[in-house]
From Swiss-Prot:
Catalytic reaction(s) noted: beta-nicotinamide D-ribonucleotide + diphosphate = 5-phospho-alpha-D-ribose 1-diphosphate + nicotinamide + H(+)
Top EC group: transferase
Binding site for diphosphate: 196, 247, 311
GO molecular function: cytokine activity; identical protein binding; nicotinamide phosphoribosyltransferase activity
Regulation: Inhibited by FK866. FK866 competes for the same binding site as nicotinamide, but due to its very low dissociation rate, it is essentially an irreversible inhibitor.
Protein name according to UniProt: Nicotinamide phosphoribosyltransferase
Gene3D superfamilies linked: Aldolase class I
Keyword terms of this UniProt record: Acetylation, Biological rhythms, Cytokine, Cytoplasm, Glycosyltransferase, Nucleus, Phosphoprotein, Pyridine nucleotide biosynthesis, Secreted, Transferase
Organism: Homo sapiens
EC number(s) reported in the record: 2.4.2.12
InterPro entries: Aldolase_TIM (IPR013785), DUF5598 (IPR041529), N/Namide_PRibTrfase (IPR041525), Nicotinamide_PRibTrfase (IPR016471), Nicotinate_pribotase-like_C (IPR036068)
Gene that specifies this protein: NAMPT
Length: 491
């Protein structure tokens, strides 16, 4: 086998081991398995445990999975043989469903006889509602629905990144509006610094793209190509960055030459924004003496379009930001905006890119507001907190079977564990609707078939190996906008 073929993705090997044995476990004469995905509501959670509630989620990332892994001819003779060999050793037994996969290869030319219906990407849906459903379209392939659970549930990651990023956008929007009276620059207030902090190149691409649903600033280049390939934008790129220093480009000049490093860098990038990490030795000395005195003449001459952005990168994030602002406020002319908050001159800004997650972000903007500093003065960079410090449990992303057909009879099925009512699952065929008041509601047990409830918001996105509906990244961004943004645009 050539190396290229060896490296090719094999859906037969992309499932949890136990699922390989499940075709032998369903009731005899099962002809349909219908399952759904949701971000479960936590009904009994002690509200004091978590500062952020995450009451709604951004649906994003299924389209990538369908296009990269599930569409087209995904079953071949070679892949069946490879899986057969692996599972014989892995289980030390011949448990693999070779016959079932050969059926898909022969009858459907290796295309998956599956239908997936999903809410439009970018939609913001309260927890506890159905987000997508999966069912087999060939009665012989009842076992296939939950075989692909494993890969489909990995959508938890882009959903969670997009949701957490949007919750941070809510915080920033609230404080920016309160301290400035407008939302100018909101989409550049949280910059993705997470490339090195994630577990893989693929994670970087997916996570960065999910953040870009809400914002436009990123240093995680991998997100750009993923969006271009799987979603598309009207603009040439969906995300932007600016020249910036790292510690090596400062410390390489030597400890006694930090001023020379700073001077060189701001001169190299005189007509665009430039971010300069300033804590290599002493952030407070850098702000007061180097920026505030020695190089002050170079800073005050910069344009509004090309500010110096000072980057602290150590210490307690809130304390450091406040002290940096205080020092800069003494060294540069501060004005008061229409809301009565202090504003640095337009050629000078701050970015805090260390220790930033949704909780510290809230603390910093609240602390700034209390000290009468406008959020206009600052932007944030977040890495691990944005792309890596998240799990499937944060939003309780879950995939469960809700309906089966056995011996020609449809049955609504569910789980309801005695020890955890939060884990109870939905019953029967599901649909998602909007009430006349505009709220989302999930109807169970096939009730959505009744016309009185209006259209189902779940649309077929995949059927029998084909992606049947796609969303552009621009549509997704529009769907995910904050209410506060829509109101501001309206005014």
């Amino acid at each position: 086998m050539n190396p290229a073929a060896e490296a090719e993705f094999n859906i037969l090997l992309a499932t949890d081991s136990y699922k390989v044995t499940h075709y032998k476990q369903y009731p005899p004469n099962t002809s349909k398995v219908y399952s759904y995905f949701e971000c479960r509501e936590k009904k009994t959670e002690n509200s004091k445990l978590r500062k952020v509630k995450y009451e709604e989620t951004v649906f994003y990332g299924l389209q990538y999975i369908l296009n990269k892994y599930l569409k087209g001819k995904v079953v071949t003779k070679e892949k069946i043989q490879e899986a057969k060999d692996v599972y014989k050793e892995h289980f030390q037994d011949d448990v693999f469903n070779e016959k079932g996969w050969n059926y898909i290869l022969e009858k459907y030319d290796g295309h998956l006889p599956i239908e997936i219906k999903a809410v439009p990407e970018g939609f913001v849906i309260p927890r506890g509602n159905v987000l997508f459903t999966v069912e087999n379209t060939d009665p012989e392939c009842y076992w296939l629905t939950n075989w692909i659970e494993t890969i489909l549930v990995q959508s938890w990651y882009p959903i969670t990144v997009a949701t957490n990023s949007r919750e941070q956008k809510k915080i920033l929007a609230k404080y920016l509006l309160e301290t400035s009276g407008n939302l100018d620059g909101l989409e550049y207030k949280l910059h993705d610094f997470g490339y090195r902090g994630v577990s893989s190149q693929e994670t970087a691409g997916i996570g960065a793209s999910a953040h870009l649903v809400n914002f436009k600033g990123t240093d995680t280049v991998a997100g750009l190509a993923l969006i271009k390939k799987y979603y598309g934008t009207k603009d040439p790129v969906p995300g932007y960055s600016v020249p910036a220093a790292e510690h090596s480009t400062i410390t390489a000049w030597g400890k006694d030459h930090e001023k020379d490093a700073f001077e060189h860098i701001v001169t190299q990038f005189s007509s665009v924004p430039v971010s300069v990490v300033s804590d290599s030795y002493d952030i407070y000395n850098a702000c007061e003496k180097i920026w505030g005195e020695d190089l002050r003449h170079l800073i005050v001459s910069r344009s509004t379009q090309a500010p110096l952005i000072i980057r602290p990168d150590s210490g307690n994030p809130l304390d450091t930001v406040l002290k940096v602002l205080e020092i800069l406020g003494k060294k540069f002319p501060v004005t008061e905006n229409s809301k009565g908050y202090k504003l640095l001159p337009p050629y000078l800004r701050v970015i805090q890119g260390d220790g930033v997650d949704i909780n510290t972000l809230q603390e910093i903007v609240e602390g700034m507001k209390q000290k009468m500093w406008s959020i206009e003065n600052i932007a944030f960079g977040s890495g691990g907190g944005l792309l890596q410090k998240l799990t499937r449990d944060l939003l309780n992303c879950s995939f469960k079977c809700s309906y089966v057909v056995t011996n020609g009879l449809g049955i609504n099925v569910f789980k309801d564990p005695v020890a955890d009512p939060n884990k109870r699952s939905k019953k029967g065929r599901l649909s998602l609707h909007r009430t006349p008041a505009g709220n989302f509601v999930t109807l169970e047990e096939g009730k959505g078939d009744l016309e009185e409830y209006g259209q189902d918001l779940l649309h077929t996105v995949f059927k029998n190996g084909k992606v049947t509906k796609s969303y552009s990244f621009d549509e997704i961004r529009k769907n995910a906008q904050l209410n506060i943004e829509l109101e501001a645009a309206h005014h």
